[in-house]
Amino acid sequence: MAKKLARIAKMVAAESKNEPAADFVNQFTKFIETSQKPYTPSQYYKPSGVGGCLRKMYFERIGQSLQDNASYNLIAMGEAGTMRHEALQEYMVNFSKKDPNFEWLKVDEYLDEHPVEGTNVDTNFVKNDFETKCKNELLQLSFLCDGLVRWQGKVYIMEIKTETMFKFNKHTEPYEEHKMQATCYGMCIGVDDVIFLYENRDNFEKIAYVYHITDDMKEQVLHKLQECEKYVELGISPKVYCNSSYCPYCRKEGRKL
C-alpha cells in the first residue's frame, strides 16, 4: 500500500511540474483554432463535392453553407496537404526542364489556344505559382487545377492527392468521387485524360493512375448538377442524406435545414 501511495504521489508531482508546459499546449492549440481566417464560401459548385453529398452541394450553391469550427489536427492536415501539393508541383516544373518527355503546361495559355465554352480563368486569384483558378459559367463550376502536363506526347490533367496509409493501401484505382471531380475538370478544360498522383502522407510513397474520362462519366456529372439545380430553382433542400457522420447537413441536427 505504501509503495502504491508513493507511486501516486510521484505521478501527481510530475503532473504539477509539467503543468506550465501542458497549459502552453492548451492555449497554443486554442490560438491555432481561433486564428483561422473566416471562410467566405463561393456559390459555384466545387468539383470535389460533386461526387459527394447532394445537400452539401445545394446549401453551398444557395450561399448558406455551414462551416464547422475546424479542430487543430484538421487544420494541420490541410496545411500539410497544401505544402505537399506545392512541393510536388515545384518538382514537376523543374522535372519538365530536365526530361524532354514531360512538359508543365500553363492552363491559361492552353485555354487560349483550346477555348472551352463557358470556361474562364480568374486572373485576379493568385494562391501560388502553380495552380490556376477556373470557372465555368454554364456548369456553375469553380475550381483550382493542380496542373496540366504533357507526358510522352499526350496532354493530361494532373491531380494530386495526399492520403493516409490506410486509404493509400486500400485502392487499386482512383476513388469514384475523385473520378467525378476529375471529370468536372475535364469538362471545363477540354482534356479527357487524367494522371492521378497519390502520395502516402505517412511515408511519402507514391503511386499514379491514368484515367480516361468517358461520355458516361460526363453524363453522370451533368445529371448531378442538373438534379441539384432543380432543388435550387424550387428553393427546397433535397431530402437525400449521405452516410457521413461528419456531414453537418446530414447529421441529425442538420436535417431540419
PLM feature spans:
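Metal-dependent nuclease catalytic cores that hydrolyze phosphodiester bonds in DNA/RNA
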Residues: M1-I157
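Short small-residue beta-strand/loop micro-motif enriched in glycine and branched aliphatics
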Residues: D68-A70, F166-N169, K206
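A structural signal for short, well-ordered beta-strand segments and their strand-loop junctions
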Residues: G49, Y156-E159, D193-Y198
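Short, glycine/acidic-rich beta->alpha junctions
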Residues: L139-Q140, P174-K179
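Short beta-strand-loop-alpha-helix junction that forms the active-site gateway
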Residues: I160-E173
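Short, structured patches in soluble enzyme cores that scaffold and shape functional sites
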Residues: V149, E159-T162, Y198-N200, Y211
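Metal-dependent nuclease catalytic regions and adjoining charged, substrate-binding loops involved
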Residues: S16, K170-Y175, C188-L257
